[in-house]
Amino acid sequence: MAPAEILNGKEISAQIRARLKNQVTQLKEQVPGFTPRLAILQVGNRDDSNLYINVKLKAAEEIGIKATHIKLPRTTTESEVMKYITSLNEDSTVHGFLVQLPLDSENSINTEEVINAIAPEKDVDGLTSINAGKLARGDLNDCFIPCTPKGCLELIKETGVPIAGRHAVVVGRSKIVGAPMHDLLLWNNATVTTCHSKTAHLDEEVNKGDILVVATGQPEMVKGEWIKPGAIVIDCGINYVPDDKKPNGRKVVGDVAYDEAKERASFITPVPGGVGPMTVAMLMQSTVESAKRFLEKFKPGKWMIQYNNLNLKTPVPSDIDISRSCKPKPIGKLAREIGLLSEEVELYGETKAKVLLSALERLKHRPDGKYVVVTGITPTPLGEGKSTTTIGLVQALGAHLYQNVFACVRQPSQGPTFGIKGGAAGGGYSQVIPMEEFNLHLTGDIHAITAANNLVAAAIDARIFHELTQTDKALFNRLVPSVNGVRRFSDIQIRRLKRLGIEKTDPTTLTDEEINRFARLDIDPETITWQRVLDTNDRFLRKITIGQAPTEKGHTRTAQFDISVASEIMAVLALTTSLEDMRERLGKMVVASSKKGEPVSAEDLGVSGALTVLMKDAIKPNLMQTLEGTPVFVHAGPFANIAHGNSSIIADRIALKLVGPEGFVVTEAGFGADIGMEKFFNIKCRYSGLCPHVVVLVATVRALKMHGGGPTVTAGLPLPKAYIQENLELVEKGFSNLKKQIENARMFGIPVVVAVNAFKTDTESELDLISRLSREHGAFDAVKCTHWAEGGKGALALAQAVQRAAQAPSSFQLLYDLKLPVEDKIRIIAQKIYGADDIELLPEAQHKAEVYTKQGFGNLPICMAKTHLSLSHNPEQKGVPTGFILPIRDIRASVGAGFLYPLVGTMSTMPGLPTRPCFYDIDLDPETEQVNGLF
């Protein structure tokens, strides 16, 4: 019989690698910027592992695969290995990775646990139990096969001998070679016998094999005489045996007696140069295959997200019943779906999470998505559905048009939840869920703001007290105490010295005059603007006297409590752009003036660092979801009158990066367009540097009827007949307000889409009239919306209009230059946005404008605090009032947040409870822990 034909693994693997190189080149041409990527994780420094890894790295480089070698020290623990595996699992740029075995660590590491932690879709070594199970079941197209058996199969196929119907014998049953080889041959239709160390009459079993694969690790165990004449012999062994003829005294042999076997076999692999090169080639092939699978599923920039189907009911159930009827997906799953890494997410149970700012750093080079702001016409006291429209729009864009989309909304105050307003999370089939989580503590951000705010308040009164009761020297000694005989200034004290122009760092060198300036803030109690806060509606805290305890030695003063969301710290949170920026803004907050008229800041009080510590978690946006499973950031909830009424810049920026250039971020501005939208543009966008693409202007038939002269609308009372019967004349008259708000939006150079939020009492004629008039007067489009009753389906036309508008030309511009005098900036807003003839600065406002300008705050943007129920200062004036002078009663400063807020009327910053508060209906089921009674 002629000697066996040699199956040259080097030559065959070279051909495979050449094909792979061509495939990689084609992939890169098809998807510019795309490169298949392999990662190899090694623990320790074994010489044999280093050798194998170098061979793999070289092969990857030759083919065009980007290979990364992660080498961990021998001191590495199992948990540390697991962290790296988790990171590689979540890294979408890594298409395959392997853990080099054995793990060379001083610590005990469970290899099986480590291997099975690898995501099966990235397990290019094919060693996880999932891939092994799929191989055993014959799912060859849905698993990765261990590289050595896969290479053996390629060598067998190279012979041209059909596998089907042949009797194959596998000697060895290891998880890496023998067992998967058995499965692979079986599902290629061979009849397979597996032999092992306990097999009786091994020579007889081997002699039955038309195909023989040997992987025992025993040098030349299988003798030539065992081989069936004409068999295909695949030898996986690499063994070192003594050989005096070799320079190093040893030679490499396989598990088969090669010289004997080649005389009986028809095909045989040499050792070395047979199976070994094929193993590396198969690793490369699996990596390229994984990259291809990734591209098949992956549409550039598209999330692979699972949406929830709504079970729509008529009549529409209560908000809380709808919220409970839809089971939210685990928030960790949603985070993964939208491209967040596990180390960027802090889970707060199953339905809410915080997102770390490191996500923004990771994605900083990704282009932003389309930026949409939802606002409204001047509303009725009932509200016109901006929040519901925001949620309905994102559900339509995401669950129905399959766009990457994020909603960014404000966190509601807990006070109104128990007061008169009830819950706020959208409504009907357009909600953020779970509703009770959204409306109650959420992740504690407002509690953190309350704690931080009240720390400042406590610091103010404590400082006044201590300065009144101590000499300069005693005060200085307590502010800069001697520790172990040494006095040192803290960092915050050194910064205060520099602001005072005292360039000294040694406390012992200060003069008496410098000690006086440093130690005394000399706060004028009459100028204190900082109030204590509480997230509860409590009317009896609107004016209080503090300091009545005997220990305060008669140092009393009149003060008040505000609702927590009225705190400047909430506005700081909403406008900050980074942790560093927040630290700076908190320090800049002006709490009072000194008796010399100089501003006193939180930094002067020495409290700004502590405030940052209290706020370090609150700065992270809160991730929740809509009923239909689209992501929502709930973050910050500043007042829309004395503050700017918008959710946080940080949430918007992270969301814009996550959705990518083709996606959408939809955020909501408080109150009507004359207030919330104007502040969104002139304050929020000015600080964020973000450029909006579309304004969605929400209008309702009932609001237009009110502006057209309809009867007064009162919350809690039935609507008058004029609002539930068709009246086209009232609608057309009231369109004047919507027309003005369209003009206001277009003043900033942004396309406007009018969303006509339909109610069951509206007629088609009324809805069509609003849409037609809107388009005639400058709206890009105007569409009827039924998202309250139908969820995303009811906002589909709106979503399509927003998509078109986002592609339309725009030229975003701000309304005024910050360098203008304070009075001129106020006048521009009053005349252009409200339609006032002029403004009148009353004496207190005139004085404050001069003081703030002198203190260096004149270049801040303006945040108008006026009624939201009219374009004018008079809430009774509907439509578009004309011929009025806007009175400015006072001007106050939120220096840390970064704006001045003129007061047009009196503003309540602490709501009260009504006769029958919402809490009458709120309770907890002790068995299910279900919250009952929220709207």
UniProtKB/Swiss-Prot annotation:
Matches recorded under InterPro entries: Aminoacid_DH-like_N_sf (IPR046346), Formate_THF_ligase (IPR000559), Formate_THF_ligase_CS (IPR020628), NAD(P)-bd_dom_sf (IPR036291), P-loop_NTPase (IPR027417), THF_DH/CycHdrlase (IPR000672), THF_DH/CycHdrlase_cat_dom (IPR020630), THF_DH/CycHdrlase_CS (IPR020867)
Residue list for modification N-acetylmethionine? 1
Swiss-Prot/TrEMBL keywords: Acetylation, ATP-binding, Cytoplasm, Disease variant, Hydrolase, Ligase, Multifunctional enzyme, NADP, Nucleotide-binding, One-carbon metabolism, Oxidoreductase, Phosphoprotein
Task: Return the annotated region ranges for Methylenetetrahydrofolate dehydrogenase and methenyltetrahydrofolate cyclohydrolase (D/C) domain.
Answer: 2-291
Q: What is the effect of changing residue 52 to F?
A: Slightly reduced methylenetetrahydrofolate dehydrogenase (NADP+) activity. Slightly reduced methenyltetrahydrofolate cyclohydrolase activity. Decreased affinity for NADP and for 5,10-methenyltetrahydrofolate
Reported effect, residue 56 to A/I/S/T: Decreased methylenetetrahydrofolate dehydrogenase (NADP+) activity over 90%. Loss of methenyltetrahydrofolate cyclohydrolase activity
Q: Which residues bind ATP?
A: 380-387
**Keyword field contains Acetylation:** yes
Name the reported effect of residue 56 to R: Reduced methylenetetrahydrofolate dehydrogenase (NADP+) activity. Reduced methenyltetrahydrofolate cyclohydrolase activity by 99%. No effect on affinity for NADP and 5,10-methenyltetrahydrofolate
Q: What is its EC number?
A: 1.5.1.5, 3.5.4.9, 6.3.4.3
Q: In which pathway does it act?
A: One-carbon metabolism; tetrahydrofolate interconversion
What the protein does? Trifunctional enzyme that catalyzes the interconversion of three forms of one-carbon-substituted tetrahydrofolate: (6R)-5,10-methylene-5,6,7,8-tetrahydrofolate, 5,10-methenyltetrahydrofolate and (6S)-10-formyltetrahydrofolate. These derivatives of tetrahydrofolate are differentially required in nucleotide and amino acid biosynthesis, (6S)-10-formyltetrahydrofolate being required for purine biosynthesis while (6R)-5,10-methylene-5,6,7,8-tetrahydrofolate is used for serine and methionine biosynthesis for instance.
**Protein's UniProt name:** C-1-tetrahydrofolate synthase, cytoplasmic
Q: Which organism is it from?
A: Homo sapiens
